[in-house]
């Protein structure tokens, strides 16, 4: 089954050309099944790029996915047109007012990691979102800053500034090969990393959380928070092949301090075309997450937050 998207959303045409199974909303309505409802709280400046990246990954599932785009209520996007936001997004306040529930929620990163969490203009509303997930979302996936924000809110785990930006493709170790989220993963995992902050392994462990993937160079990468039905990934499996290149070129052109991304360009030559060596693991991770949603979410969506099941038992 495909991912259900409005046929006017830019991601619809992009993913159709890539061979991803997408279906317009009127076609999906003809199928007599309950789709998995997944929300995307998009905190990134380039909304369309981010929508497409995550729709690509969750849309590779054989299950029908209904993707809902959500934004913060009082934060206006400076990099995406108001027309796009008005047509395709709802504010969190609007979603909350309906009382609706979701099988999954993705909370993206945001380029604000230099700020203390409490200084972020929408922090108070994000706290409401995170608390709301405990009654209205079956499983939440926090990405990069979004994952750090959840770990901080639920467990007081601090983010720590790095002396230099962790930037490039770093090798990680699969530390939990029996985890259902790592089904099909190799022992050695390459992940794109782009951040000025880190969370530390000892603080993750002290909070009772499980590190599933980690690196000696850049620390924990994928963490499971079973008590809050959440995963936190601090790196960027969703990145396109040239996302790190775009970030490098942007900073280099602006004269900002930036190193050539590690283990990304062939021969570390920024004039060479980068190769995508993380795509298969990206699809595995998000496909496994969607599979776990299907196996454990209540069939009656109104039971989310009240009950769960497991079709394997």
UniProtKB/Swiss-Prot annotation:
Record pathway: Amino-acid biosynthesis; L-methionine biosynthesis via de novo pathway; O-acetyl-L-homoserine from L-homoserine: step 1/1
Marked site: Important for acyl-CoA specificity: 113
Keyword Acyltransferase in record: yes
Residue pairs linked by disulfide bridges in the UniProt entry: none
Annotated GO biological process: L-methionine biosynthetic process from homoserine via O-succinyl-L-homoserine and cystathionine
Sites annotated Important for substrate specificity: 194
Active site: 144, 236, 238
Parts of the chain that traverse the membrane: none
Gene3D superfamilies recorded: 3.40.50.880
Gene Ontology annotations for the cellular component aspect, listed alphabetically: cytoplasm
Catalytic activity field: L-homoserine + acetyl-CoA = O-acetyl-L-homoserine + CoA
Subcellular location: Cytoplasm
One Pfam family recorded for the sequence: HTS
Top-level enzyme category: transferase
InterPro entries recorded: Class_I_gatase-like, HST_MetA, MetA_family
Predominant place of localization: cytoplasm
Keyword Transferase appears in the UniProt entry: yes
Molecular function via GO: homoserine O-acetyltransferase activity; homoserine O-succinyltransferase activity
Positions annotated to bind substrate: 165, 194, 250
EC number(s) recorded for this UniProt protein: 2.3.1.31
Entry-linked PANTHER family: HOMOSERINE O-SUCCINYLTRANSFERASE
Family listed: Belongs to the MetA family.
Role, per record: Transfers an acetyl group from acetyl-CoA to L-homoserine, forming acetyl-L-homoserine.
Record protein name field: Homoserine O-acetyltransferase
Encoding gene (name): metAA
